[in-house]
């Protein structure tokens, strides 16, 4: 939706002094916290020592999110899937470029790099300024400060990496955006990157209507809420002939022991398939 201008209030103290202009960017701190929490568990599903390190340096108090079990487990399941997809792409493709859109303070490069391919981190300029303090760019892990809805960076990547194959990861971001903007983004990608893979997560329109049920979203008041939902898995195919649905994975079917009582949410029709992770491919023949 519209850009939410930064305003300080009681619920925002976690990000005081970081200068994020858009409230959505604050959720970068939340995912960082959940990954740090996971790293300290003996039965951890992912390991992210960099998240622990950055949180310590920031010195922000995230304790009000300590018991947000559903959000924490969901974040880790999502991170694990996108890490796994990134590793597969880097291993299997000849000249891969993986672009992390709205990367926040996530260091997927550290978790997944095996010495081959390029991973590009992109987020809004104010977020990237903060990111640089903790995660400096490198030749195989460059950074771009831009809106994902612009096309300049897309053309720049095509110029910088000719003969490469691209994958785009959009983690934990689309549900906060405007549907028309997302459609434009997917169309712009489809027309420029034939053969690319798109990996993203989405919530249903039922979840959008009930976003205050989300245990972490509640903490942010009205500045952060779900605005875009996807119901039909193939709905996005209608946006461009090059877009093809490949697969879906549902959160709630995984790591049942970690969800605890929350598995009962499967009984609520809107919840069972309310949160999902998808892969779309851009057909090889697609061209502007």
Model-derived features: positions:
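A conserved beta-strand element that flanks and buttresses the S-adenosyl-L-methionine
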Residues: 168-169
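Short, glycine-/aromatic-enriched active-site segment of Class I SAM-dependent methyltransferases
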Residues: 208-224
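Conserved beta-strand signature within the Rossmann-like core of class I S-adenosyl-L-methionine
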Residues: 192-205
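A short, conserved alpha-helix within the catalytic core of class I
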Residues: 176-188
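Core SAM-dependent methyltransferase catalytic element
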Residues: 258-288
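Short "lid" loop at the C-terminus of a central beta-strand within the Rossmann-like core
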Residues: 149, 175, 203-208
